[in-house]
């Protein structure tokens, strides 16, 4: 994320027909994902969406996409920064009727550097857990062979592990309204 906070569904369109075409495409993608995941448990749906986003979005290091912070940049151009990954995850969870929130704050990367960042909390079996699809994407890690430990390093995590590298700030809008995020489980999902 570039440090600026923005509203959940913020897209830029040049014309009404462009907007309609993009929204139709996004809705088609969302409905197709929903159709393919029909009959799966919520855990499996969350895991499949996590994996699908990683497989279909490339981290936009050079901000080449028209909308790297948005759902349309992520899902229609296949390029996004953390905010695009997190917004897309929430967009699909909403379709699947799995409670999910977008979280902004700071992340401490493997070099010990702190940066503005965005991720999600998702509810499963009555408890909230953290998911950072962006940092689970191998392209962020330099592309080499990725083990499950790396691919799911930030998948359904509790406070005890997630807060070592992630600190929510409670702000998620341009007018700096403060939000209280759900309290996530202390332990990782088993």
State what each model feature region is:
Residues 144-190:
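Low-complexity, Gly/Ser/Thr/Pro-rich intrinsically disordered linker/tail segments
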Residues 1-3, 190:
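Intrinsically disordered, low-complexity N-terminal segments that are enriched in acidic
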Residues 56, 60-66, 76-78, 112-115, ...:
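Repeated polar recognition positions within modular binding domains
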Residues 17-21, 76-80, 104, 109-111:
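Alpha-helix capping and helix-loop boundary segments enriched in small/acidic/polar residues
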Residues 84-159:
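Hydrophobic/aromatic-rich core segments of domains that either
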Residues 4-8:
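Extended, well-ordered protein cores
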Residues 16-74:
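Secondary-structure boundary elements
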Residues 71-85:
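A short, highly charged nucleic-acid-interacting micro-segment common to nuclease
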């Amino acid at each position: 994320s570039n440090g600026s906070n923005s509203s959940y569904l913020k897209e830029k369109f040049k014309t009404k027909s462009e907007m309609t075409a993009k929204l139709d495409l996004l809705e088609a993608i969302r409905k197709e994902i929903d159709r393919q995941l029909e009959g799966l448990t919520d855990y499996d749906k969350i895991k499949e969406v996590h994996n699908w986003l990683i497989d279909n979005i490339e981290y936009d290091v050079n901000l080449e996409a028209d909308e790297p912070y948005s759902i349309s940049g992520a899902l229609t151009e296949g390029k996004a920064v953390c905010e695009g990954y997190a917004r897309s995850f929430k967009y699909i969870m909403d379709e699947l009727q799995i409670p999910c929130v977008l979280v902004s704050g700071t992340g401490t990367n493997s070099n010990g550097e702190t940066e503005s960042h965005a991720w999600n909390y998702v509810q499963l079996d009555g408890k909230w857990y953290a998911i950072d699809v962006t940092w689970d994407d191998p392209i962020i890690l330099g592309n080499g062979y990725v083990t499950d430990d790396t691919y799911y390093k930030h998948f359904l995590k509790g406070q005890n592990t997630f807060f070592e590298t992630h600190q929510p700030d409670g702000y998620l809008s341009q007018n700096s309204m403060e939000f209280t995020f759900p309290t996530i489980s202390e332990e990782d999902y088993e």
